[in-house]
């Protein structure tokens, strides 16, 4: 039961803003949503190659949901989308996919020998069991596939600490998998031995979460596109949702919040009783902000974002199936990093989509900083070395890409807290989410699960509770 009718302005129509708007309306409040861009959904961006329900599509933004992300799973259920949840096949899930090594591209099922040889060379001089070497080889392989450039060297440095010595004292036999027992089930291992996490030093400690999440066998997608989550929310919101309304200034006063908005017809300053800001801090820090505490301004400027760039090709056909790949992803290395093979949905005569390159961090900035045509050419050249079928006449019908680090509405793909311990992460979350008078905050940057949809939903629900309780300063 609401503690009284309130008029609330929500800034930003990403998942956090839309969830909050819907929840606030259900509590009886009057809500309007202002979005600077001409598109709803924020970093959920399903690109469709044409019009109609049967056209191929690709997720240029969020594309997967871990089953443990209960905020998202529960909300999908609330919106009636649970039947659409299907398995998301990721890196290392299809043993026919490729992995780049010093010996070139090898199938995942054949990669163990090369990976072990590479890791043994890295660990030369250390007396470790063969099973421990196998553990280290596969953890390094996953880290290489997922970690941005500035992180990969740190992974190897952390292996020189105590981690492998701890692992070397554990019975690893139950975690050897594959026909030749030359693959290692990292998920089962860390689940069975959580104490090993305390041996991870530096950046590796935080990154293990991402390693396990991004290669988890328990990842889901929305059949038909992730934008169905956005569409379902928009359909349920009764208040105005205005696109093309760009915020340039926020001024927090004792009894209201003044928001300066550019809407294409001029500049207006809106006076709102309560404002919920879901604008990423990477964008918010460039606005004119007054009336906020020194601590809030500091955290707005200090939160670190990482980039992500995706390049996709609509192909004449899913040629990778002829090559024995039935989904999942390959690690191509170089500038392309990860290549995904989404399921073919819709009319197969319209082709199939290859997510040719998914990069993060510094790797994403390299591709993201290129003109679009050059970016597509570079990716075609590098992925073509792994999949020469791409160079067949007429195989690539069209290309599309999104560089989130260059996107003026996000200035990054998500917040990173790698290298921070649990206490530091919680302190950052608390400072980011803390309201300033009648100005409240939500978004993945205000959550305990940054860079995921779950963080957006979690923070939106928390902000709604704070608005209801009147927790503003």
From Swiss-Prot:
GO biological-process terms attached to the record: amino acid catabolic process
Enzyme class: oxidoreductase
InterPro entries per UniProt: Amino_oxidase (IPR002937), FAD/NAD-bd_sf (IPR036188), Flavin_monoamine_oxidase (IPR050281)
Example GO molecular function: FAD binding
Residue sites binding FAD per the record: 15-16, 35-36, 43, 61-64, 444, 451-456
Family that this chain belongs to: Belongs to the flavin monoamine oxidase family. RebO subfamily.
Function field: Involved in the biosynthesis of the indolocarbazole antitumor agent rebeccamycin. It generates the imine form of 7-chloroindole 3-pyruvate (7Cl-IPA) from 7-chloro-L-tryptophan (7Cl-Trp), with concomitant two-electron reduction of O(2) to H(2)O(2). The enzyme is also active with L-tryptophan as substrate.
Complex formation: Homodimer.
Name the UniProt record assigns to this protein: Flavin-dependent L-tryptophan oxidase RebO
Source species: Lentzea aerocolonigenes (Lechevalieria aerocolonigenes)
